[in-house]
Design a protein with these regions (language model features):
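Intrinsically disordered, low-complexity serine/threonine- and proline-rich regulatory segments
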Residues: 1-10
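A charged, amphipathic interaction segment
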Residues: 62-130
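Conserved, aromatic- and glycine-enriched, well-ordered alpha/beta core segments
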Residues: 9-84
């Protein structure tokens, strides 16, 4: 898949590193790798890519651990509950329609202040909303 190759090689144009493409990358790794390995590839890949386009991964910018793990868990749940083991055009189309891809989805589980805290960026924090 071209997106994955460009992501891994840090040749993906910055404007193509969209919210949606973050999810496509997560979907790919969650299908191709055991979950712990997928999480590592996603996390390390985002950090590496951010730096390759001039970004920094600090306690107030760049990679965000809680957001990454939250959404990777949602992707894994989607795959497991539907017994998906490969990516097809049909699966990708359905995946991209899922409610958890909407940017505001995470706000059902996290307050903005808590999610944007230094601690949440640097390490996993469980949701603060019921």
């Amino acid at each position: 898949m071209k997106l994955i190759e460009q992501f891994e090689n840090c040749t993906l144009p910055k404007e193509e590193w969209t919210h949606e493409n973050h999810f496509v990358v997560a979907l790919w790794y969650c299908i191709k790798c055991p979950l712990p390995e997928a999480i590592q590839k996603i996390s390390n890949g985002i950090k590496k890519y951010n730096e390759s386009v001039g970004g920094q991964n600090t306690d107030d910018a760049g990679y965000h651990e809680t957001i990454t793990l939250f959404y990777t868990s949602a992707v894994a749940d989607y795959l497991i509950t539907r017994k998906i083991t490969s990516v097809t055009a049909e699966i990708l189309h359905d995946f991209l329609q899922q409610p958890f891809l909407k940017k505001e989805f995470i706000s059902r589980f996290y307050s903005q202040e808590y999610l944007m805290s230094k601690e949440a960026r640097l390490q996993w924090l469980a949701p603060d909303k019921n």
